[in-house]
Swiss-Prot record:
Name listed for the protein in its UniProt record: Chaperone protein DnaK
GO molecular function: ATP binding; ATP-dependent protein folding chaperone; unfolded protein binding
Gene: dnaK
Pfam families in alphabetical order: HSP70
Induction statement: By stress conditions e.g. heat shock.
Domain of life assignment: Bacteria
Modified residues (Phosphothreonine): T201
Stored InterPro entries: ATPase_NBD (IPR043129), Chaperone_DnaK (IPR012725), Heat_shock_70_CS (IPR018181), HSP70_C_sf (IPR029048), HSP70_peptide-bd_sf (IPR029047), Hsp_70_fam (IPR013126)
Organism of origin: Stenotrophomonas maltophilia (strain R551-3)
Length: 641
């Protein structure tokens, strides 16, 4: 069995790790970086860029560069959070036929967020394969603890599209706790809090790490969070401030200019990062836009104090879930041994200060906030693969699950913070006399009124024997697997008729759509391979042409015109072939030129009485093959990263 890799599929950055020699380690990508921007771009010539190369060209291609799509995954277009995001991104977000939020390129090609995420997962998969030297097919992927069922399903679908069998979906704070806890050599029992403020989501989990009969047990006591609170929101506050200041000064609203918006996004992110270590920075964007009077430049000073005032409300928003999680766990802040910070946004001093004030203790600084989650996912992969022993992980469901009952009431069957996997059943009855069928409406959330909770699915149980209302007994059973994904069944206890469903949210991709996307991804991988082979053939042909021209310059005067004529003709044919996309033609014309080059050297050698004047033309090209391959690798990595 191959390695089960661990992937932190982040809103802003992603990271991949494996178990290596009994320890989890992060793998560097083809650019030598330990994290990869979760950005995908589509260029005019149809090329797909992922990671750093996509980020580099974002300013010149804003409408076709997709970032932070994790905030859209598993969501409806009409969700308030999605509507809020539309105002802040330069690319198009639109409604799919089933009401889901999808994205579109400037030429109106529609894509699901799962497809975009799959491109990032493919990059992570390839990073692991390059390091291991073998094919990777299995992964543990992390999600925010507060992701609902639809968002978890959508993440699994993204894995399938990327060619991965997702063995487990694991919550990000739990993964970070695994990475932290396994690193501790002692067997001391401790209760810890993981405060995870990432690029797009916020989670807080209270976790007990205990030694039980020689086994390290990680039990999640409570979790809470906000799936639309993260570094992107901090960036947006800075962008709004810069836009308002520029509008006051110049009377121009930069929100209407996608190119300016993308430049502002980059500048806001840079300024925010700089202000974690500096007290003041300057946002300087020359030629940010223009009007009838000429080009306009943006130059605004931003202090740390101003940034903190802009995001103060967001930081406060992250503290309330901490209070709820502690309360749900039945603990006080004094019961907590350690506070672990995860996610890039926790590097902000004001965030660290707020966490310190609430929990009454300094958070740990020895956990890498960008890598801990991927390391934990790799450890869970090791547990599933049998490489890591004596570790037991007990996670929880973040939100209550239940059904809609008479009067629009939400009746909970499984309460939030229940350890998973778990099963629970409850018996219900009919609301009308002689009712022969019931509709089971499955929901997730905490509100008493069903309509305010997240609708997961509806299904019918028919064939109930006619009887007065209240007499038939319908048993509804909920079963949550280790991924936090729900299976529901309804059974008439008298007739034993049963209806079972694995919850596939009313939103989400159909099996046909997933199959199409998997096929598209496979086709693209084949296209990429062909493209690489074509570029390699062109590079080798180019080296051969260079070597042959050098040979003509050096030895042309020593041989007859007919020999030179054949070489020149072969050169012209190869140069023509190189302008096309036929790899076989380029290779065939290269062979003809090699043979013509050998004739040139043979003739020159004969003129000099049999002494070879130098390497043959074929070898002149071949001698550089390794160099050309290295050049190609760099080009490929830059363009395909």
């Amino acid at each position: 069995m191959g390695k089960i890799i661990g992937i932190d599929l982040g809103t802003t950055n992603s990271c991949v790790a494996i178990m290596d020699g009994g320890k989890a380690r992060v793998i560097e990508n083809s650019e030598g970086d330990r994290t990869t921007p979760s950005i995908v771009a589509y260029t005019k010539d149809g090329e797909v860029l992922v990671g750093a190369s996509a980020k580099r060209q974002a300013v010149t291609n804003p409408k076709n560069t997709f970032y932070a799509v994790k905030r859209l995954i598993g969501r409806k277009f009409t969700d308030a959070e999605v509507q809020k995001d539309i105002a802040h991104v330069p690319y198009s977000i639109l409604a799919h036929d089933n009401g889901d939020a999808w994205v579109a390129t400037s030429d109106a090609k529609k894509m699901a967020p799962q497809e975009i995420s799959a491109k990032v997962l493919e990059k992570m998969k390839k990073t692991a394969e390059d390091f291991l030297g073998e094919k990777v097919t299995e992964a543990v992927i992390t999600v925010p603890a507060y992701f609902n069922d639809s968002q978890r399903q959508a993440t699994k679908d993204a894995g399938r599209i990327a060619g991965l069998d997702v063995k487990r979906i694991i919550n990000e704070p739990t993964a970070a706790a695994l990475a932290y806890g396994l690193d501790k050599g002692d067997n001391k029992d401790r209760k810890i809090v993981v405060y995870d403020l990432g690029g797009g989501t916020f989670d807080v989990s209270v976790i007990e790490i205990a030694n039980v009969d020689g086994e390290k047990q990680f039990e999640v006591l409570a979790t809470n969070g906000d799936t639309f609170l993260g570094g992107e929101d901090f960036d947006n506050r800075v962008i709004e401030y810069l836009v308002e200041e520029f509008n006051k000064d110049q009377g121009i609203d930069l929100r209407k200019d996608p190119l300016a918006l993308q430049r502002l996004k980059d500048a806001a992110e840079r300024a925010k990062i700089e202000l974690s270590s500096a007290q003041q920075t300057e946002v300087n964007l020359p030629y940010v836009t223009a009007d009838a009077s000429g080009p306009k430049h943006l130059n605004i000073k931003l202090t740390r104090a101003k940034l903190e005032s802009l995001v103060e409300e967001l930081i406060r928003k992250s503290i309330e879930p901490c209070r709820v999680a502690l309360n749900d766990a039945g603990l006080r802040s004094s019961d907590i041994s350690e506070v672990i910070l995860v996610g890039g946004q926790t590097r902000m001093p004001k965030v660290q200060q707020a966490v310190t004030e609430f929990f009454g203790k300094e958070p740990r600084k020895d956990v890498n906030p960008d890598e801990a989650v991927a390391l934990g996912a790799a450890i869970q992969g090791g547990v599933l693969g049998g490489d890591v022993k004596d570790v037991l992980l007990l996670d929880v469901t973040p939100l209550s699950l239940g059904i809609e009952t008479m009067g629009g009431v939400f009746t909970k069957i499984i309460e939030k913070n229940t350890t998973i996997p778990t099963k629970a059943s409850q018996v219900f009855s009919t609301a009308e006399d002689n009712q022969s069928a019931v509709t089971v409406h499955v929901l997730q959330g905490e509100r008493e009124q069903a309509r305010f909770n997240k609708s997961l699915a509806k299904f019918d149980l028919s064939g109930i024997e006619p009887a007065p209302r209240g007499l038939p007994q319908v048993e509804v059973s909920f079963d949550i697997d280790a991924n936090g994904i729900l299976h529901v069944s309804a059974k008439d206890k008298k007739t034993n008729k049963e209806q079972k469903v694995e919850i596939k949210a009313g939103s989400g991709l159909s099996e046909e759509e997933i199959a199409r996307m998997v096929a598209d991804a496979e086709a693209n991988r084949e296209e990429d391979k062909k493209f690489q082979e074509l570029v390699q053939a062109r590079n080798q042909a180019d080296a051969l042409i260079h070597g042959t021209r050098s040979a003509i310059t050096e030895h042309g005067s020593k041989v007859g015109g007919d020999v030179i004529g054949k070489v020149e003709a072969a050169l012209a044919d190869l140069e023509t072939a190189m302008k096309g996309d036929d790899k076989a033609q380029i290779e065939a014309k290269s062979k003809v030129l090699e043979e013509a080059g050998q004739s040139l050297f043979a003739a020159a050698s004969a003129e000099q009485g049999g002494a070879a004047p130098g390497a043959d033309a074929g070898n002149a090209g071949k001698a550089q093959d390794d160099v050309v391959d290295a050049e190609f690798t760099e080009v490929k990595d830059d363009k395909k990263s």
